[in-house]
């Protein structure tokens, strides 16, 4: 990581809340340790590259035992070996998160091998950018997106949450998108699946609050990854590096905020609430200004992106792991 990027990551990690926790709250009786990740067992999905890999490295640097999850065993082994070589502790758990039996096996392996999971980062996912007008006969786009973005993390949480409840402590971080606030055109499949996970976790957080289990939804802005390459409109837009995005995830693990938003997303949410029809008109113009990609129109297929317009995000266990948030 170059020096400017390292400085930005450091700034993101040093929030006022973190400063108070480390300098004030840590001295109070019964307070969490100044380094709340030390000794924690943290499972990170989509950990073979991108945000997931960067998150795993940051967690290991803070003394956590990291359980690396993705489909590609070779990529996971590389990340595990590099973390171990840097003095950290990591274990590779290859898993196809789109396969329910594989997820159930992952839960059993994590519980048997490590005695439980203290914190979970639901980072793996899939993004599709395609107009609904081009999706009349593509129900499978919505099914595939829900499978990895919603059903997989819910199944994983249902397997790991009982142990957290029994111990009276646990935390789940969901890597989402500011699109859940913006409701950006052409991302119906992607944003709907992320919104489902956002809502599920908010409700679970209320039900499990009394048991010491909390949830954070990180509504991520655009992240500079390979996946945004086919979308020319993104080329000149500002974007986070995977390391900067991972710093937000680590902040969520350490400080346990309810949500981490970005200002444009919050402003768009207010706009949608205060002037919904005007918002529709504005986003309709945006929709026409940025047309579907050639891949989404079925004219070409991006390398390693699967069906037209379908790409992996969040360093998930797909053909090539990477992430984007509209």
Language-model regions, residue ranges each:
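The beta1-alpha1 cofactor-binding region of Rossmann-like NAD(H)/NADP(H)-dependent oxidoreductases
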Residues: 94-106, 139
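Conserved glycine-rich cofactor-binding loop
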Residues: 48-49
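Conserved glycine-rich Rossmann-like NAD(P)H-binding loop of the short-chain dehydrogenase/reductase
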Residues: 62-78
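Non-catalytic terminal and boundary segments that flank Rossmann-like NAD(P)-dependent oxidoreductase
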Residues: 1-38, 281-326
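Conserved mid-core segment of classical short-chain dehydrogenase/reductases
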Residues: 127-143, 186
């Amino acid at each position: 990581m170059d020096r400017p990027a390292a400085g930005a990551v450091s700034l993101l990690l040093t929030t006022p809340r973190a400063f108070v926790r480390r300098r004030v709250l840590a001295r109070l009786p019964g307070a969490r340790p100044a380094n709340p990740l030390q000794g924690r067992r943290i499972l990170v999905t989509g950990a073979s590259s991108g945000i997931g890999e960067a998150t795993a490295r940051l967690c290991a640097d803070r003394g956590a035992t990291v359980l690396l999850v993705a489909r590609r065993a070779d990529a996971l082994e590389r990340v595990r070996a590099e973390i171990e070589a840097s003095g950290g502790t990591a274990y590779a758990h290859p898993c196809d998160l789109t396969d329910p039996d594989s997820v159930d096996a992952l839960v059993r392996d994590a519980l048997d091998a490590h005695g439980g999971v203290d914190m979970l980062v639901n980072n793996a996912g899939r993004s599709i950018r395609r107009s609904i007008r081009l999706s009349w006969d593509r129900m499978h786009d919505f099914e595939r997106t829900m499978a990895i973005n919603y059903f997989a993390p819910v199944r994983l949480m249902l397997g790991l949450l009982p142990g957290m409840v029994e111990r009276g402590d646990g935390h789940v971080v969901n890597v989402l998108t500011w699109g859940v606030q913006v409701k950006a055109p052409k991302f119906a499949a992607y944003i709907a699946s992320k919104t489902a996970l956002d809502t599920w976790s908010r409700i679970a957080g209320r039900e499990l609050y009394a048991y010491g289990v909390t949830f954070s939804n990180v509504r991520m802005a655009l992240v500079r990854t390979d996946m945004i390459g086919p979308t020319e409109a993104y080329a000149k837009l500002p974007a986070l590096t995977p390391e900067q995005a991972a710093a937000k995830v680590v902040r969520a693990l350490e400080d346990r905020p309810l949500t981490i938003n970005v200002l444009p997303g919050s402003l768009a949410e207010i706009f949608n609430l205060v002037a919904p029809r005007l918002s529709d008109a504005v986003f309709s113009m945006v929709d026409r200004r940025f047309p579907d990609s050639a891949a989404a129109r079925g004219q070409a297929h991006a390398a390693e992106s699967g069906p037209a317009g379908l790409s992996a995000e969040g360093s998930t266990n797909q053909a090539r792991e990477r992430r984007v948030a509209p």
